[in-house]
Protein backbone atom coordinates (compact mmCIF):
# COMPACT_ATOMS: atom_id res chain seq x y z
CA UNK A 1 0.00 0.00 0.00
CA UNK A 2 1.48 3.31 -1.07
CA UNK A 3 0.83 6.26 1.23
CA UNK A 4 1.21 9.83 0.02
CA UNK A 5 3.61 11.77 2.20
CA UNK A 6 2.24 14.72 4.16
CA UNK A 7 4.40 17.04 6.26
CA UNK A 8 4.12 16.18 9.93
CA UNK A 9 3.43 19.80 10.93
CA UNK A 10 0.44 19.86 8.55
CA UNK A 11 -0.84 16.59 10.01
CA UNK A 12 -0.58 18.01 13.52
CA UNK A 13 -2.52 21.11 12.45
CA UNK A 14 -5.23 18.96 10.84
CA UNK A 15 -5.54 16.40 13.64
CA UNK A 16 -5.37 18.80 16.56
CA UNK A 17 -4.78 17.95 20.22
CA UNK A 18 -5.37 14.21 19.76
CA UNK A 19 -2.36 13.90 17.45
CA UNK A 20 -0.01 10.96 17.99
CA UNK A 21 3.35 12.75 17.68
CA UNK A 22 6.42 10.88 18.92
CA UNK A 23 8.33 12.81 21.60
CA UNK A 24 11.49 10.71 21.27
CA UNK A 25 14.16 12.57 19.30
CA UNK A 26 15.62 10.55 16.43
CA UNK A 27 18.51 11.45 14.13
CA UNK A 28 17.79 11.62 10.41
CA UNK A 29 20.34 9.22 8.88
CA UNK A 30 18.91 8.02 5.56
CA UNK A 31 19.00 9.65 2.15
CA UNK A 32 15.22 10.03 2.09
CA UNK A 33 14.26 12.59 4.73
CA UNK A 34 10.51 12.40 4.12
CA UNK A 35 8.73 9.05 4.17
CA UNK A 36 5.40 7.53 5.06
CA UNK A 37 3.81 4.11 4.99
CA UNK A 38 1.97 1.38 6.83
CA UNK A 39 3.71 0.30 10.02
CA UNK A 40 5.28 -3.09 10.63
CA UNK A 41 7.17 -3.72 13.86
CA UNK A 42 10.06 -5.71 15.28
CA UNK A 43 11.24 -5.81 18.88
CA UNK A 44 14.82 -7.04 19.22
CA UNK A 45 17.68 -6.22 21.58
CA UNK A 46 21.22 -6.06 20.19
CA UNK A 47 20.30 -8.81 17.68
CA UNK A 48 19.31 -8.09 14.08
CA UNK A 49 18.60 -11.52 12.56
CA UNK A 50 14.80 -11.19 12.87
CA UNK A 51 14.98 -7.62 11.57
CA UNK A 52 16.93 -8.78 8.50
CA UNK A 53 14.42 -11.57 7.91
CA UNK A 54 11.49 -9.13 7.96
CA UNK A 55 13.27 -6.72 5.59
CA UNK A 56 13.90 -9.62 3.21
CA UNK A 57 10.15 -9.68 2.58
CA UNK A 58 8.39 -7.28 0.19
CA UNK A 59 7.87 -4.00 2.03
CA UNK A 60 5.07 -2.58 -0.10
CA UNK A 61 6.07 0.98 0.79
CA UNK A 62 5.90 0.25 4.51
CA UNK A 63 7.80 1.64 7.47
CA UNK A 64 9.49 -0.81 9.84
CA UNK A 65 9.56 0.41 13.44
CA UNK A 66 12.31 -1.36 15.37
CA UNK A 67 12.38 -1.31 19.16
CA UNK A 68 15.96 -2.06 20.06
CA UNK A 69 15.38 -1.05 23.67
CA UNK A 70 17.18 2.24 23.08
CA UNK A 71 20.53 0.46 23.13
CA UNK A 72 23.43 2.26 21.49
CA UNK A 73 25.84 -0.59 22.29
CA UNK A 74 25.43 -2.37 18.93
CA UNK A 75 24.06 -1.34 15.55
CA UNK A 76 20.88 -3.02 14.35
CA UNK A 77 21.03 -1.64 10.79
CA UNK A 78 23.93 -0.92 8.45
CA UNK A 79 24.32 -0.36 4.74
CA UNK A 80 23.72 -4.01 3.80
CA UNK A 81 20.42 -4.28 5.69
CA UNK A 82 19.28 -0.81 4.60
CA UNK A 83 19.96 -1.73 0.96
CA UNK A 84 18.00 -4.96 1.45
CA UNK A 85 15.09 -2.90 2.76
CA UNK A 86 15.30 -0.41 -0.11
CA UNK A 87 15.50 -3.16 -2.73
CA UNK A 88 12.43 -4.85 -1.22
CA UNK A 89 10.31 -1.72 -1.36
CA UNK A 90 10.39 -0.45 2.22
CA UNK A 91 9.91 3.33 2.51
CA UNK A 92 11.76 3.73 5.78
CA UNK A 93 13.08 2.44 9.08
CA UNK A 94 12.61 3.96 12.53
CA UNK A 95 15.13 2.42 14.93
CA UNK A 96 14.99 2.84 18.70
CA UNK A 97 18.67 2.02 18.85
CA UNK A 98 21.85 2.44 16.84
CA UNK A 99 22.78 2.05 13.18
CA UNK A 100 26.16 2.04 11.43
CA UNK A 101 27.59 2.91 8.01
CA UNK A 102 26.02 6.35 8.38
CA UNK A 103 27.87 7.89 5.42
CA UNK A 104 26.54 5.16 3.13
CA UNK A 105 23.02 5.44 4.58
CA UNK A 106 22.91 9.16 3.72
CA UNK A 107 23.41 8.24 0.06
CA UNK A 108 20.61 5.66 -0.06
CA UNK A 109 17.05 6.28 -1.22
CA UNK A 110 15.43 5.07 1.98
CA UNK A 111 14.38 6.81 5.17
CA UNK A 112 16.37 5.86 8.25
CA UNK A 113 15.82 7.40 11.67
CA UNK A 114 17.73 6.14 14.70
CA UNK A 115 18.88 7.30 18.11
CA UNK A 116 22.53 7.27 17.08
CA UNK A 117 25.38 5.29 15.59
CA UNK A 118 27.86 2.63 16.70
CA UNK A 119 30.15 0.62 14.38
CA UNK A 120 29.80 -2.52 16.57
CA UNK A 121 27.83 -5.40 14.98
CA UNK A 122 24.85 -6.95 16.71
CA UNK A 123 24.40 -10.64 17.43
CA UNK A 124 22.44 -12.83 15.03
CA UNK A 125 20.49 -15.40 17.05
CA UNK A 126 17.03 -14.41 15.80
CA UNK A 127 15.74 -13.37 19.21
CA UNK A 128 12.82 -10.96 19.20
CA UNK A 129 9.18 -10.45 18.26
CA UNK A 130 7.42 -9.09 15.21
CA UNK A 131 4.05 -7.46 14.56
CA UNK A 132 3.62 -6.31 18.17
CA UNK A 133 2.58 -2.90 19.45
CA UNK A 134 5.62 -0.78 20.28
CA UNK A 135 5.42 2.35 22.44
CA UNK A 136 8.11 4.99 21.94
CA UNK A 137 8.06 8.62 22.98
CA UNK A 138 4.48 8.47 24.22
CA UNK A 139 3.12 7.00 20.98
CA UNK A 140 2.05 3.43 20.29
CA UNK A 141 3.13 2.16 16.87
CA UNK A 142 0.55 -0.46 15.90
CA UNK A 143 1.07 -2.66 12.86
CA UNK A 144 -1.19 -1.40 10.06
CA UNK A 145 -1.31 2.19 11.28
CA UNK A 146 0.49 4.82 9.17
CA UNK A 147 3.77 6.51 10.10
CA UNK A 148 4.74 9.88 8.63
CA UNK A 149 8.31 11.04 9.16
CA UNK A 150 10.25 14.17 8.21
CA UNK A 151 12.77 16.60 9.70
CA UNK A 152 10.17 17.81 12.23
CA UNK A 153 9.42 14.39 13.71
CA UNK A 154 7.14 11.37 13.46
CA UNK A 155 3.34 11.31 13.46
CA UNK A 156 1.24 8.14 13.58
CA UNK A 157 -2.26 8.01 12.11
CA UNK A 158 -4.84 5.23 12.23
CA UNK A 159 -4.59 2.92 9.22
CA UNK A 160 -7.47 1.91 6.98
UniProtKB/Swiss-Prot annotation:
Source taxon at top rank:
Bacteria
Write down the chemical reaction(s) this protein catalyses.
4-hydroxy-4-methyl-2-oxoglutarate = 2 pyruvate; oxaloacetate + H(+) = pyruvate + CO2
UniProt entry keywords in alphabetical sequence: Lyase, Metal-binding
How, per the record, is the cofactor bound? Divalent metal cation.
Name the cofactor(s) required for activity, per the record: a divalent metal cation
Q: Which SUPFAM superfamilies match?
A: RraA-like
Which residues does substrate bind? Answer: 78-81, 100
Ligand binding (a divalent metal cation): 101
Gene Ontology terms for molecular function = 4-hydroxy-4-methyl-2-oxoglutarate aldolase activity; metal ion binding; oxaloacetate decarboxylase activity; ribonuclease inhibitor activity
Q: Which InterPro entries match?
A: RraA, RraA/RraA-like, RraA/RraA-like_sf
Q: Name one GO biological process term.
A: regulation of RNA metabolic process
Answer whether the UniProt record assigns the keyword Metal-binding to this protein. yes
- Keyword Transferase on this protein? no
Enzyme Commission designation? 4.1.3.17, 4.1.1.112
Annotated PANTHER family: 4-HYDROXY-4-METHYL-2-OXOGLUTARATE ALDOLASE 3-RELATED (PTHR33254:SF4)
Q: What task does this protein carry out?
A: Catalyzes the aldol cleavage of 4-hydroxy-4-methyl-2-oxoglutarate (HMG) into 2 molecules of pyruvate. Also contains a secondary oxaloacetate (OAA) decarboxylase activity due to the common pyruvate enolate transition state formed following C-C bond cleavage in the retro-aldol and decarboxylation reactions.
Q: What is its quaternary makeup? A: Homotrimer.
Protein family according to the UniProt entry: Belongs to the class II aldolase/RraA-like family.
Q: What is this protein called?
A: Putative 4-hydroxy-4-methyl-2-oxoglutarate aldolase
